[in-house]
Amino acid sequence: MARVLKVAAASAAGLFPRLRTPVSTVRTSASLSSHPGAGPVWNLGRLNHVAVAVPDLEKARAFYKNVLGAEVGEPVPLPEHGVSVVFVNLGNTKMELLHPLGSDSPIAGFLKKNKAGGMHHVCIEVDNINVAVMDLKEKKIRILSEEAKIGAHGKPVIFLHPSDCGGVLVELEQA
């Protein structure tokens, strides 16, 4: 069996030569510029969390804690964002369970369209959110607020318009 896997891997590497070539990471917006040193510099960091809107917060907590055995936090109401959140520790990242807090919550609107809940957004850390905002605006990426707001982790966050991000709502959080 091990020999079969080695042969398959070797064949795949031959078919896909890029698999053997290290991929250079795009680290800064300036690295994309044709003029070295031009433009603001900011670094994209790790995936902080994946947020999932849930119609029943306690049921979702129980699933991740009792069925999957994950480390699950307590619900935290965030009235300024119109949500209650629960973080599920997944080792190298987190899942954020979102539940509406009030009828005008953006999550209430999401759950009206998606009765069973579902993936709401991804959150990626950046090393300088203010410079990232300036650079993204210059690149015509729409930001859903005029300025960064304090998010669930007590750090500045912004959201990027899904239409500019391949249909995904992207949250950037100051690392």
Swiss-Prot record:
The modification N6-acetyllysine is found at K149. Co(2+) binds at H49, H121, E171. The keyword Mitochondrion applies. CDD domains: MMCE. This is Methylmalonyl-CoA epimerase, mitochondrial. One of its GO terms (molecular function) is methylmalonyl-CoA epimerase activity. InterPro entries: Glyas_Bleomycin-R_OHBP_Dase (IPR029068), MeMalonyl-CoA_epimerase (IPR017515), MMCE/EMCE_epimerase (IPR051785), VOC (IPR037523). Residues 46-175 form the VOC domain. It comes from Bos taurus. It is an enzyme of class 5 (isomerase). The modification N6-succinyllysine is found at K113, K149. One of its GO terms (cellular component) is mitochondrion. It catalyses: (R)-methylmalonyl-CoA = (S)-methylmalonyl-CoA. Belongs to the methylmalonyl-CoA epimerase family. GO terms for biological process: L-methylmalonyl-CoA metabolic process.
